[in-house]
């Protein structure tokens, strides 16, 4: 039980981890991480604006933009169906939101000039460059797969913790707490490392060398969004099937 308690404490305390300086707003006596909110709002505005443009005037013969958005939707459906199974339909919006938010957030770190915006403390960066964002996304995924299992199986969902033998109960419980930890640290670590490498190379050789690294970073950022969305869908499918 000590291991489970430590895991719970880790999930609670991890949001206090800080890398570098941060800019906070004081709202109702609470410190709100302003950097993450500002950049997250920009990403959400980009996604909402793109969605409005995509559905504003659909054509019978699709335009290039409409074809692109239909391809993205089909791609998300394929990922969801592959990992969840035939009952994937209700989960497409969730998986799609996760994938698109992470994808645009990751790319914003490389393509948007966040650094030119001056703050009293710290600097703006991709939302996924902050551990608070990645932990929040991972916890949302945890809530989603618990909900998926309970909505399909009711209280019988908890029988999975004593399968194939009750001896594995502590390990099976601990596994549910390590999933969000691994999701959050994988995404946070990769995006932070990518931005740090680019910053260091730009400071050392500001002309040519960082360009290939930036393209590699864009590729890795896309892969990280796909990995997160795929694992989220896999966890949801696993909870609905009731096996590991």
From Swiss-Prot:
F-type ATPases have 2 components, CF(1) - the catalytic core - and CF(0) - the membrane proton channel. CF(1) has five subunits: alpha(3), beta(3), gamma(1), delta(1), epsilon(1). CF(0) has four main subunits: a, b, b' and c. This is ATP synthase subunit a, chloroplastic. GO terms for molecular function: proton-transporting ATP synthase activity, rotational mechanism. The keyword Transmembrane helix applies. Keywords: ATP synthesis, CF(0), Chloroplast, Hydrogen ion transport, Ion transport, Membrane, Plastid, Thylakoid, Transmembrane, Transmembrane helix, Transport. It is a multi-pass membrane protein. Key component of the proton channel; it plays a direct role in the translocation of protons across the membrane. Signal peptide: none annotated. GO terms for cellular component: chloroplast thylakoid membrane; plasma membrane; proton-transporting ATP synthase complex. It comes from the Eukaryota. The keyword Chloroplast applies. HAMAP family: ATP_synth_a_bact. The chain crosses the membrane at residues 35-55, 92-112, 131-151, 196-216, 217-237. It is found in: Plastid, Chloroplast thylakoid membrane. Belongs to the ATPase A chain family. CDD domains: ATP-synt_Fo_a_6.
